[in-house]
């Protein structure tokens, strides 16, 4: 029986490359000279922006987002937190990466597939939604219906099997 999986993943190698490019650009750009603006990564692959002012922190976030977009990483996978004051009159901002389907999002996807009226079944399996059907055309229609719903998270369709 044909099936496919709906997942929400981020290519961590592309994030790493974009992070390094953004860090180099911030170190070399004239408008960032002397502002003590820097990017750091933690173990959970989140990005911490430290800057001397809110404007420089926002500009650093824009540089990071630009580099991620050029590398093909969906910007919906970023979750920038609020700017918070740090020591020495600086500010910092944590940018979290959204990875994996949350249960609420998976339920919304299943509900969208069911309300579309296509003859397929959707089931939540861990951090993925498996959609099965009798015909390949039904599965392609389900993919189209999910894409048309415009969920606020980046979705990928994997393991399309006949």
From Swiss-Prot:
Keywords: Nucleotide-binding. InterPro entries: DUF520, UPF0234-like_C, UPF0234_N, YajQ-like_sf. One of its GO terms (cellular component) is cytosol. CDD domains: YajQ_like. The keyword Nucleotide-binding applies. It comes from the Bacteria. PANTHER family: UPF0234 PROTEIN YAJQ. This is Nucleotide-binding protein AnaeK_0101. It comes from Anaeromyxobacter sp. (strain K).
């Amino acid at each position: 029986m044909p099936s496919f999986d709906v997942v929400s993943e981020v290519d961590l190698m592309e994030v790493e490359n974009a992070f390094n490019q953004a860090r180099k650009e911030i170190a070399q750009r004239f408008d960032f000279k002397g502002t003590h603006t820097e990017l750091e990564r933690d173990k959970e692959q989140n990005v911490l922006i430290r800057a001397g002012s809110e404007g420089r922190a926002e500009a650093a976030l824009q540089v990071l987002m630009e580099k991620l977009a050029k590398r093909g990483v969906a910007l919906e996978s970023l979750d920038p937190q609020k700017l918070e004051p740090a020591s020495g009159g600086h500010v910092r901002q944590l940018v979290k990466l959204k990875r994996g389907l949350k249960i609420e999002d998976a339920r919304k996807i299943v509900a969208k597939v069911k309300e579309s009226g296509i003859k397929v079944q959707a089931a939540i399996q861990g951090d993925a939604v498996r959609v099965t059907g009798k015909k390949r055309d039904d599965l392609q229609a389900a993919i189209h219906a999910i894409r048309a719903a415009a969920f606020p998270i980046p979705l990928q369709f994997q393991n399309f099997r006949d």
